[in-house]
């Protein structure tokens, strides 16, 4: 008897939440129309009706159109703002970032560029005694915790098991959304060419001391062959929590995070992910290797030897970086970013993002961030 295989579930996102005003326009466009109408009445009462018709009304409709018309997911006003910000950045030379002892960075450090330059790290321990690190943004009163993820979703499983994992992932997100203090959750899946150090270390551990020399050589050569330029998949989940100023000042937020992290990590296993809090050394090495890929083998060797790298959060950034219109250059490499213009309008299955996340032969390094 052949069992009937369960069909994949069709998912849908629905319509995004949107605040609408007059005639379906956005609230910002409605405010512009209201201000324009008020200015029109004021000009009429002042006896300046000609200016009301020739200046106020055209200007009001022009501003409303700039705010309302959207191209590839952004309004014309947002494009104008981005162009103005890029012009100001280039005119002041802020698009070129240089760190180190001879730079203008305070203390000669190699801080992360942009808004991350003002962040700092705080180390704590959860209720299970595991070390975790919180990236603190004091002006915004936000603390971000990073969970290191090992994905198990590519193992052989039935459609029913995949459906259950997808449902558990949705349930995990829904539980976090009900807490009220979580600002954002970002899932990052990164692929990179493996250096072979991790495979060689695993093989060395499983070889018995009394193994024949020919068997030992065969195993080591096989490990060397399969580990050359083989892609490795890294993943982490960043959870940003909002706190009050008192909790930020006395670092009491670390105790609160310490009680919540074990619950966040343990429930992820039902969604096919093994999660552990990322330590400060692990976070700094991962962020720095994103900016400077040449440092990855060094970090791996230090990790296998059980030696800390001694790099602080204030030195996790690049030495040199340049922001261009079509790419971002940093420490001898070049990165290009693509943004999803809009979410799928129709229904989709749970494998929608699989081709985007899995390693690709023609893309050596890539990172996919789901916000």
Predicted segments, located by residue:
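Hydrophobic, membrane-inserted alpha-helices
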Residues: 33-43, 60-63
């Amino acid at each position: 008897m052949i069992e009937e295989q369960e069909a994949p579930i069709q998912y849908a996102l629905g319509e995004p939440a949107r605040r609408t005003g007059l005639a379906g326009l956005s609230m910002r466009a409605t405010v512009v129309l209201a201000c324009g109408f008020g200015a029109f009445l004021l000009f009429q009462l002042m006896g300046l009706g000609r200016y009301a018709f020739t200046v106020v009304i055209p200007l009001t409709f022009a501003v409303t159109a700039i705010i309302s018309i959207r191209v590839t997911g952004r309004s014309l006003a947002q494009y104008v703002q981005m162009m103005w910000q890029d012009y100001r950045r280039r005119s002041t030379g802020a698009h070129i970032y240089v760190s180190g002892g001879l730079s203008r960075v305070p203390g000669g450090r190699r801080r992360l560029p942009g808004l991350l330059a003002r962040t700092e790290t705080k180390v704590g321990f959860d209720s299970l005694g595991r070390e975790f690190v919180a990236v603190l943004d004091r002006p915004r009163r936000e603390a971000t915790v990073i969970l290191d993820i090992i994905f198990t979703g590519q193992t052989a499983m039935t459609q029913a098991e995949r459906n259950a994992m997808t449902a558990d992932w949705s349930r995990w997100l829904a539980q976090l959304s009900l807490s009220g203090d979580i600002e954002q959750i970002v899932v990052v899946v990164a692929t990179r060419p493996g250096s072979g150090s991790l495979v060689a270390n695993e093989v060395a551990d499983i070889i018995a001391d009394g193994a024949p020399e020919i068997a030992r050589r065969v195993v080591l050569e096989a490990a060397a062959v399969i580990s050359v330029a083989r892609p490795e998949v890294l993943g982490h989940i960043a959870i940003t929590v909002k706190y009050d100023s008192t909790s930020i000042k006395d670092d009491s937020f670390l105790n609160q995070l310490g009680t919540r992290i074990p619950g966040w990590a343990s429930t992820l296993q039902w969604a096919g992910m093994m999660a552990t809090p990322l330590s400060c050394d692990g976070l700094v090495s991962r962020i720095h290797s994103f900016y400077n890929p040449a440092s990855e083998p060094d970090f791996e060797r230090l990790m296998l030897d059980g030696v800390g790298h001694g790099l602080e959060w204030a030195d996790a950034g690049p030495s040199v970086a340049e922001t261009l219109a079509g790419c971002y250059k940093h420490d001898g490499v070049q990165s290009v970013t693509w943004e999803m213009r809009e979410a799928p309008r129709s229904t989709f299955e749970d494998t929608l993002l699989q081709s985007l996340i899995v390693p690709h032969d023609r893309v050596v390094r890539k990172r996919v961030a789901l916000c």
